[in-house]
Amino acid sequence: FRNLPIAQLTQSEFSAFLTKLGVGAEKSISIRQAIKNSPSKISNLITTPLMLTLVVIVYEAESQIPETLPEFFDRLFQTVFSRHDRIKAAFTRKHYSGLSEKSLQRLFEAFCFMSLQSGHGRTISQSQFDEIFDHACEYADQSNCDSMKFKQDIVQVACLMLEDGVDSYTFLHKSIVEYYAAAFVLSLGDNNAKMFYSSTIEKSSGWEETLRFLRSIDSFRYFRDYVIPIVNAERTEVLASIVDNSNESIISTFKRLYPGLGVYFRMDTETKGAVKVSAYGSIIERSADHLTGLGFLLMDALAEMTINVNTIEELNSQFNAHPEHAIDDLGVHVPAEALLRAYGAAEVRKAFDSYKNKLDKLADEANEIVGKENKKSLIFSRRQSKSEIG
């Protein structure tokens, strides 16, 4: 046996598929219009007939498409079990696991978190499924069931995962594992949630979309324990080192943060004697880039600096570099330091200024959200004051 790729479902095919589902013409129009107008951009998730089916089920239960993706996924789990049962009165879905809907959802959230924590992708093997399940059971209350029955609930009943070949299982959409992993973090107490956010400050790779969901559903702790520490660290590590705004401080900071960044040039096969940019080198992962994109700002600056480097002659005379000397298909590499010394640091200085503005905006947003939440503690002090007066 072998797996064959299938084309993604397109919006032009929604109408025909809804007809196949038995959806009437009027309701079909309403559903397609709701999908199109949804502020949550739910249409980006609908790449398979099954995903469209689940969207229809949620729409029938809610009479609308939830406004945000977190709201959609929250409604989705409830809908595929209890709410769908009430809509289809003659149809009762059996919970193979024997768990209540709430306990099953908590276990699935832990399962999704452990899947990401283990570094697995969207598709996992049977042995990986069992291993993740065992870990998830350790962190989900009232989860007394076995792996096979849990899998039946998630694959056969909820359809949030699919059998993919003989010995593997795939999440219906990558956003499913990312959202429910975020929901698991939301359920954690303050100390454990803070440990999670601290760990992603050190290494955010693989957690980027989960963090975006947490920005919506756990905004207070997201900004308090993740954004504010990153902003403070970046102001110290980056902005403080270029406070004098000199070329030398900018060059040394650039080299320290992104030592592999530069520009690759290769010969332009369409124009004799011409060169073109083929790549910008490697970026060492920095968690702050997930929030501010400093690495991409600096690549844009390098692009502006080299916009007039068009010929082999100029490349060779300025940097003693010739595409014929390239050791791979990328071309010949010119380090960022050489470019900065040749053309000055004005463009990179602009990039750091943009970076500072982004940090300032993040700090303002974070302080506003955290401040509003902290202000709520005054409610209790006022109650106490009134009782003392009485």
Give the location of each predicted region:
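Extended hydrophobic
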Residues: 1, 8-169, 174-176, 184-187, ...
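Leucine-enriched alpha-helical scaffold segments used for protein-protein interaction
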Residues: 5, 29-36, 135-171, 175-390
